[in-house]
Regions:
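Extended catalytic cores of very large enzyme megasubunits
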Residues: 1-127
Length: 127
């Protein structure tokens, strides 16, 4: 999902396959341990990609990720290197919340192809 986010963030269209034979190789999500990991999201595409990556990695270890969006420019702020304006953190936060719901619904079970596709769509919607 990290690579997916980077490619989307750089304006590249992305297609992928969610075949069951590959999804079956993914581990089950661990039971929630009650542990939380605080992550400050950096204001660049790599920071956004890392936030999705760490959210999934933590979920496999039973850890819930709590995000701090304070470093992200507000909506409408100019983007100096790429032109245009910043979207703000709201779409990213919405994607994190939606992905967390999928993760919460799958504790101690395995993802299916719809889960993976939904996660990818939430990421694309944020980028």
């Amino acid at each position: 999902m990290y690579d997916l986010t980077l490619l989307l963030g750089h304006g590249v269209g992305v297609g992928f396959s969610v075949e069951g034979r590959y999804i079956e190789q993914w581990p089950f999500l661990s039971p929630h341990t009650g542990t939380k990991s605080n992550v400050v999201v950096q204001d660049n595409i790599e920071g956004w990609a890392f936030s999705f990556y760490i959210q999934l990695v933590n979920a496999f270890d039973g850890i819930k990720t709590v995000f701090d969006y304070s470093k992200i420019r507000p909506a409408g702020a100019p983007l100096l290197t790429r032109g245009g304006t910043a979207s703000g953190y709201e779409l990213l936060e919405r994607a994190h919340v939606a992905i967390q719901k999928i993760l919460d619904d799958r504790w101690c079970t395995q993802f299916d192809s719809v889960d993976i596709f939904d996660i990818a769509c939430h990421i694309a919607g944020a980028i």
